Amino acid sequence: MLEQMGIAAKAASYKLALLSSCEKNRVLEKIADELEAQMESILSANVQDVEQARANGLSEAMLDRLALTPARLKAIADDVRQVCNLADPAGQVIDGGLLDSGLRLERRRVPLGVVGVIYEARPNVTVDVASLCLKTGNAVILRGGKETHRTNAATVLVIQKALKACDLPEAAVQAIDNPDRSLVSEMLRMDKYIDMLIPRGGAGLHKLCREQSTIPVITGGIGVCHIFVDSSADIAPALKIIVNAKTQRPSTCNTVETLLVHQDIAERFLPALSKQMAESGVTLHGDETVMQALHGPAKLVALKPEELDNEFLSLDLNVVVVENMDGAIAHIREHGTQHSDAILTCDMHNAARFVNEVDSAAVYVNASTRFTDGGQFGLGAEVAVSTQKLHARGPMGLEALTTYKWIGFGDGTIRA
């Protein structure tokens, strides 16, 4: 089954690579229209997925990840339309020039070909990835989690209907709808057909892909994000940033999970933090210093060492008091995932040092980690957030779904 999907996807990718930007935008507009027109069927499938997930005991954080509402689905359709407004990188000439030999050389962006994406309980990923791949002239094979297999299947049918209406192969966007986990291992070995693989899920999925894939893999999306409250931080705006970074949407990978507090500001800052977190419904997981310093009003539990390496994806926040900037940077290097980290400070020397020494895909000064997002960065919908350093890093927009080829123009030109 998968080999036939790969053959069809590869054939579709050749046709997609020839489309003009206008033709690709026409497809995307049709997809957005169909998502709204077929909203009832998608939401009906999603309700079944959510009910099944709840019966299986999934956490509220996970249920929020997989749930769709009319407003969320409308926002997804609007995101597709926003992709239409983005510049198409395919075909762009990056650089080039006339060589001494008389050969005119240029380096041109081209589609990757076929992209494979393995993801878990986020049904919006189906549309986000499909729209970005189509915009850049790539075909895509999707393998969503079993928790959302009905939603994903319904969504892909809508996308394929739009492709067919635009006289394009339905195989340009395909989904593996069989929940059999052994198919993931089979997909990881489809290097004959898939040019790049992107896993979006937990640490276990990323480890599996790194160890078993014969396809180049872009890993990321695991966000143990930190905020360091420096000794010079202005407490009022610092609290506002922390509330945003923790509570705006706790189930996302750019949510702060650990707060590092400079010991020189801890006595003044921690009581204010506790009051604010109590109002926001956040449970604090405190180290020994925090446990001794606070006695309410926020719910406070003792921090377990293993929690420093975990994504809560819920209204829980680690709070650790550090001796100085060195301690904060060392902590992030040991426990961070190179996703998004921030410093809150009024000392620009410390800010510059933090930016230079924290090796994450996104580093912020006096701002929320929640900004690490393709839309917020002006990239449109993102296919993933890469925490590795090769090919792509940070939110992966359109350019990350292209490679380049060298093209030489001559006039009977030969090498001397």
From Swiss-Prot:
Superkingdom, natural source: Bacteria
Principal subcellular localisation of the protein: cytoplasm
Keywords: Amino-acid biosynthesis, Cytoplasm, NADP, Oxidoreductase, Proline biosynthesis
A molecular function GO annotation: NADP binding
Gene3D superfamilies xref list: Aldehyde Dehydrogenase, Chain A, domain 1 (3.40.605.10), Aldehyde Dehydrogenase, Chain A, domain 2 (3.40.309.10)
Any one cellular-component term (Gene Ontology): cytoplasm
GO biological process: L-proline biosynthetic process
Keyword Oxidoreductase listed: yes
Enzyme class: oxidoreductase
Family of this protein: Belongs to the gamma-glutamyl phosphate reductase family.
Name of the protein: Gamma-glutamyl phosphate reductase
Organism of this sequence: Salmonella typhi
Gene: proA
